[in-house]
């Protein structure tokens, strides 16, 4: 039985916890919240550290030096981070769900995730190039695709 099936999130080692991240890059996108409805909207404006082809952070180990507001996902805050996509492994496991079929821990690579359209690969622009963020709201797959 795989560690994510036999352990709670709180029981996982730091290495196991980190490996849950599929590397989709969606958490690194700028998001908007409608003032009236409180609806959440993702944009294709990506963090300046996000590699647009690999969907990985270019300076992960020292990202807080470059982006102090970068969020650390922990067992203590996972239930508060409602802006994480429904497909996020942390959210799914916290809700008692399984990993999606395309998750790198199940497939052995990120390729299935990219092919399923579940990553930001090739879909984003550098946030520094965005003038009007509302023009960058996206509708591409943000929900679960199992």
From Swiss-Prot:
Q: Which top-level group of life is the source organism from?
A: Bacteria
**One Pfam family matching this protein:** CxxCxxCC
Q: InterPro entries, per this entry?
A: Puta_zinc/iron-chelating_dom, UCP006173
Q: Which family does it belong to?
A: Belongs to the UPF0260 family.
Q: What is this protein's name?
A: UPF0260 protein Sbal_1871
Q: Please tell me the species this chain comes from.
A: Shewanella baltica (strain OS155 / ATCC BAA-1091)
